[in-house]
A protein has these predicted regions:
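Glycine-rich, aromatic-flanked loop segments that form ligand/cofactor-binding clefts
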Residues: 25-32, 148-152
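Extracellular/periplasmic, surface-exposed regions of secreted and cell-surface proteins
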Residues: 1-16, 39-98, 108-325
Length: 325
């Protein structure tokens, strides 16, 4: 590492710190046995052990529940209806505590603790109606359906500082701190949903000539009003040449198929839930400093650049291929 202006080092992480820290540098301060040693020949040294101590009380726990179920109804000889529902739910609990004595950062914060709990649930509902019909050498399949996805995320966080240095680590959680009016709580919630309508028609003759047409319409709450719906068709055709009479007696060809297709797909991955809306930050005031017990939050600056033309990213693909086996 390189010492900069005698105030610190440009080291990052425990591994690099372990490599660059002199082996003869003391770990504990001789004058304060409960504190890690920092003053190494005028440099503000942070030992690897101190870096590790900052996370001694950190905990991260994730519980996940996956459920799915469905029903299939045979409405007629060639007509079926299938309805499925699935749920993916996660509960995350993260907590941290840094005592006010051992580490230099803990002393500047007078000890600090945080606790964050979040609940993330995603539901998917699918309903598909399928009609199959075969006659002579013809085979026809028609499918129509809907798919809906909803997602709700919620998070509550709290933090405290000013922990007792007399009874160190006695209460390593939020209850042991005293903020004295400093805001240390936050809450967040976001929701989004997608509604899709699906259709497909597939036809083949004698398993040699195959044609498929697909269409889907997707509407997303992440996109701006008036631009939320996208329409994406696709088509494909194939000719199984190996099924023709002039190749049936060729023993070294099991399958030979010429295929071609064109289609469009929509993408909204990476978009925030409310990117099309103008968002603002919130200013909070410490009433103990302003001497105003009635101090209330005010609207701050802009948090994003709104885009009221936000819509689907549409990509088109064309493919032609020859399958041989």
């Amino acid at each position: 590492g390189t010492i900069i202006s005698g105030q610190g080092a440009n080291r990052a992480g425990v591994v690099v710190s372990a490599i660059t820290t002199p082996t003869y540098a003391p770990i504990w301060d001789p004058e304060n046995p409960q504190q890690f040693y920092n003053n190494f020949y005028g440099a503000n040294l942070t030992s690897p052990r101190e870096n590790m101590a900052r996370t001694d009380y950190n905990q991260d726990v994730t519980d996940r529940l996956l459920l799915s179920g469905g029903l299939t109804f045979y409405l007629a000889k060639d007509l079926t209806f299938k309805s499925t529902v699935s749920m993916d739910r996660r509960w995350v609990h993260s907590s941290s505590f840094l005592d006010p004595i051992r580490t230099s950062y803990g002393r500047t914060q007078h000890g600090t603790a945080s606790d964050t709990r979040s609940d993330d649930m995603r539901m998917i509902y699918d309903n598909i109606l399928t009609w199959n019909k075969s006659f002579d050498r013809h085979s026809l399949e028609v499918m129509a359906g809907t798919s809906a996805t909803t997602s709700v995320w919620e998070q509550l966080s709290g933090s405290r500082s000013y922990f007792s240095s007399t009874n160190n680590n006695a209460i390593p959680n939020l209850n042991g701190g005293n903020n004295g009016g400093v805001r240390g709580q936050s809450y967040g919630k976001s929701e989004w949903s997608i509604m899709s309508y699906l259709a497909r028609v597939s036809y083949n003759y004698d398993s040699k000539y195959l044609v498929t047409a697909n269409f889907r319409a997707d509407g997303s709450s992440k996109l701006a009003p008036g631009h939320r719906w996208g329409y994406f068709p696709s088509f494909s055709a194939a000719w199984r040449i190996s099924g023709e009479k002039f190749l049936r007696d060729v023993s070294w060809i099991n399958d030979l198929k010429l295929r071609a297709g064109w289609g469009q797909t929509g993408n909204q991955a990476g978009l925030a839930e409310y990117g099309w809306m103008q968002q603002y930050s919130t200013n909070y005031y410490d009433w103990t400093l302003t001497e105003n017990a009635q101090a209330v939050p005010t609207v701050g600056g802009r948090k994003n650049i709104k885009n009221q033309d936000l819509t689907w990213e549409t990509s088109s693909q064309t493919n032609v291929g020859l399958d041989f086996a």
